[in-house]
Amino acid sequence: MTKDTTSPPDQAGGTVAMAVLNAIQNPVVMVDESGFIAFANWEAEAFFGAAFASGALPDLDIHSFGSPLLALVDQVRTQGSPVNEYRVDLSSPRLGQDKLVDLYVAPVLSEPGGVVIVFQERSMADKIDRQLTHRAAARSVTGLASSLAHEIKNPLSGNRGAAQLLEQSVIDDDRALTRLICDETDRIVSLVDRMEVFSDERPVRRMPVNIHSVLDHVKRLAQSGFARNIRITESYDPSLPAVYANRDQLVQVFLNLVKNAAEAVGDRPDGEIMLTTAYRPGIRLSVAGTREKISLPLEFCVHDNGPGVPADLLPHLFDPFITTKTNGSGLGLALVAKIIGDHGGIIECDSQNSRTTFRVLMPASKDASLEDASSASSTGPSR
């Protein structure tokens, strides 16, 4: 016996259908024959940034007339068959930048002229692809650092020694030149030392770590130094499980991110940095060469209200030697990406409308609760 899907569902069936649609993690909307939104699930309301009981599709400011989405709706109505469209750009002032989606558009047989639209955001997939590219770039720096470090540092040491000897025999007016040679030699050696960090493949000690303890420690360091005049707030999920990691390296990661945020905020009187944690189920990353998928439910964010990151720099932000700072080396964020990648996680950056967010996604520890991690991670530093 088949159910008559052309008749209106009873109240119980309608309630179940609504619950099912609201449980779907993708935005779903239904458009009636007049182009009005007849239904939107919770994810759609979050996606569009509005709660709509009814509203014309063009009024959603997705695109002006002739947009790919509106054209797909017309095509489905005309042909009466579903259509898939991939990598559709829905970026707009309302939705923000980097709104790349895959669309599934299908007719609603029980509603003449009705069309259902399912949005699959590609932002996360594309960011993961970029993260893998960042790791490859970090590996290239690793190989370069490993092979060239000694070849560069040894002759530089000789040059510096020769400059120091010259300094003892030249006239006062020329000592500034020998001092310049020493200073520039020290600067290059310092850069090579930072590059050598990428080639350090020694295993590090990992244990269940309370991320809130790490963030609180970083906050204290920041407020006693470079961020003493900046308001730092936090919004933590107290039920968050522990992260299996090296505590010292996590401190290094978030101290770097908070320092970048403080430099972005600068001296503005309303400058603010916010630290947040949350549990986000449903994010899984495939492991290359296997069928295994790693779940990355732990989300740690550093937000700031600085001027933001230039759009043309965002895709390359974690590449080595990319920086907007006058005297920056461009290795800080590359090292952050390497550490997070070594822990099986990913890092991404969103920047728009004077708000920048660095988001770290990591796997949870299976061996201990957050309370256990608090006592374990407070026993002392780890290598």
Curated annotation (Swiss-Prot):
Residues 147-366 form the Histidine kinase domain. GO terms for cellular component: cytoplasm. Keywords: ATP-binding, Cytoplasm, Hydrolase, Kinase, Nitrogen fixation, Nucleotide-binding, Phosphoprotein, Transferase, Two-component regulatory system. One of its GO terms (molecular function) is phosphorelay sensor kinase activity. Its main location: cytoplasm. It catalyses: ATP + protein L-histidine = ADP + protein N-phospho-L-histidine. It is found in: Cytoplasm. Autophosphorylated. GO terms for biological process: nitrogen fixation. It comes from the Bacteria. Signal peptide: none annotated. The modification Phosphohistidine is found at H150. Member of the two-component regulatory system NtrB/NtrC, which controls expression of the nitrogen-regulated (ntr) genes in response to nitrogen limitation. Under conditions of nitrogen limitation, NtrB autophosphorylates and transfers the phosphoryl group to NtrC. In the presence of nitrogen, acts as a phosphatase that dephosphorylates and inactivates NtrC. This is Sensory histidine kinase/phosphatase NtrB. The gene is ntrB.
